Regions:
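The alpha-helix within a helix-turn-helix
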Residues: 21, 32, 61
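Short, charged recognition helix plus adjacent turn
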Residues: 72-92
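A short, Lys/Arg-rich alpha-helix, primarily the initiator
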Residues: 2-26, 73
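Residues within the helices of the helix-turn-helix
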Residues: 18, 29, 58
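Short alpha-helical DNA-recognition segment
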Residues: 26-44
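Residues in the recognition helix of alpha-helical DNA-binding motifs
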Residues: 20, 34, 45-48, 74
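DNA major-groove recognition helix of helix-turn-helix/homeodomain DNA-binding modules
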Residues: 55-70
Length: 92
């Protein structure tokens, strides 16, 4: 997964999840129910309106057989990217 991580770091984990669900032909609502999560919560993450949290990332990673911590690592890289953009936009 490290090679993939280097390619996609800076992308919101929800966008990666959306692509993965489509690739596997998994319905977003059914997936939310399978991991015992509210569909609205999952949708907000997929739309990048909400950050990934540890509990949810572990559920998703287990269900989709991702390496543990993969989605949270994506979230951290995304947060770094956003913070860097904000810092560049505001002068010291």
């Amino acid at each position: 997964m490290n090679d993939i991580l280097n390619i996609i770091k800076g992308i919101h984990p929800g966008k990666f999840l959306e692509r993965e669900l489509k690739k596997r032909n998994i319905n977003q609502r059914q997936f939310a129910m399978a991991i015992n999560e509210h569909p609205q919560t999952l949708n907000a993450i997929i739309k990048a309106k909400r950050s990934m949290n540890i509990d949810l990332s572990l559920k998703i990673e287990k269900e989709l057989n991702f390496d543990e911590g993969f989605l949270m690592t994506l979230q951290v890289f995304y947060d770094i990217k956003i913070t860097n953009k904000k810092n560049q936009a505001t002068p010291d």
